[in-house]
Amino acid sequence: MKDHSKKTIIQKHSYGVLLFTGNEKDRKYLIVQNRDSESFIYFFLAWNIERWNEHYLLKVVKGFSRDELNRLLYYPFDLIYTDLYVNHVKGTYQRQYNRAKFNYTYFHSRADWVKLCQNVPTTEIKWGFSKGRIENGEHPYNCAIRELQEEVGIVENDIVLHPTMSPIHYRNEKLLFRTFVNVCLFPAECPYQLPVIYQQFANTIRCMSVSNEILHARWVSLEESFFLLPTNLYRLLYEFHITNRS
């Protein structure tokens, strides 16, 4: 008989870009704002939602933005799903659709859940570094560059690899035990000026995204990042800054 007492943790990897520019005294880092919060995506992808208790439901929903909570409460499922999954990949689309629809339908079948969530305090959508899932056989650096191009509009010619930096690994225990790997890059014209693509946008830009996953991108100092990034990402950035001085 198999021993089911221990939970098996499946590692999932995402690859991203820690993009920076400027000199040592005035270094800026590019962070992006997700269109959808991690909690909102997790709600529609989670298995066994029918086993959730009220405490866990509230823990997930508190990570929504106010707009996302309103969408869950008042929008029809197909409208939410079309907005959430803009790239319909054959094979995975139907599986994700069925799971997401089950979660939505089950939530609305529970009048106590709906009432409980109507006045839940929500958060702002988090800032972070551009990241995405690696494809089969794809090199991590190629994945990072592809994600940066798809989500923010930067092409490979605009950036070069940091000469001494290896990928940074950090864990997010709250999101499917996923391991994020940030690949360090900087603009080809660094440290003297920003790439041409940003010169007309000043500090905050509207992303030229083809996937609609990202709302905004912004160059921030280490100090500014403290107010925008989650604690684990801020720590990652701080450790990178103090251990990789030019």
Describe the role of every protein-language-model region.
Residues K2-K6:
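Short, basic/aromatic recognition patches
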